[in-house]
Amino acid sequence: MQAKLTRRQFIARAVAGAAGVVCLPKFIRAQAVESAAKATLYVVHGKDIPKMFSTGIAKMGGWKSFLKKDGKVVLKVNAAWASLPEQGGNTSPALVEECIRHCRAAGAGEVLLPEKTCSPFKESFKRSGIAEAAARAGGKLYSPEKRHFRNVEIRQGVSLKQAEVVGDVLDADCLINMPVAKSHGGATLTISMKNWMGSVNDRGYWHRNNLHQCIADFSTFIKPKLIVVDATRIMLTNGPQGPGKMAYPNQLIFGTDPVAVDAYAATLFEKQPFSIGHIKIAHAMGIGCGDLSQVKIEHVNT
């Protein structure tokens, strides 16, 4: 029987596995190398979510790096499923609440949380605990209707050439992506890049037209100022809805490079980052860096 790898050993192997991109066309490899600047991730460990979140924001330079006074903050959480917080189908309501409180304290004019759900939205918002958390902290969680969407062109898209996107996402002064990390039957994993499907009107098109490519295509267009991945608990199987087998990394992952963020999060599932189609494609397209040997990862204990 093969000995179980430590987290450090697994990440080391994932770094070595980055050599797999050599099978990509030369011009695409060159684009990826040239456009992927050295990314930095802060991985905060602990069990006290408010303390973990405050620590991560401080490491990222504080709210002055992201917010302007009276600006519109749009927080893209995962609130798609009518499941309980402990089941890991949605972003932790405690994390959502803490982020909204921080934004309000830092001077945000409003904090909006649009989410096109998979389960009926009233049930999803209530059962996930996110509706109550958002209301307590001064945020507005809502299910977008047809009138809330605007059609946009995805100029660098390969499979996805246009999309109807929630207008508030397009108009945000500060756009924050706060997904939960979990398994997914179609995309293998859903982390930050996949999370944007909850901000578009027709997610079915993505599923029918090369899902991994569409996920990467949309990330050529959408540029959040901050990404915070909820990896306090992760759903290893039966995602995205669950229930499934759970693990408890007790981590929050902070960054601005969606490809680097997702590549690191993939290792929590003992996956090589480039075994995930949309991570490999996004790296090749130059959206960010999925090669963990080129990413600065700072671990912080709280």
Task: State what each model feature region is.
Residues 2-302:
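N-terminal and secondary-structure boundary signal
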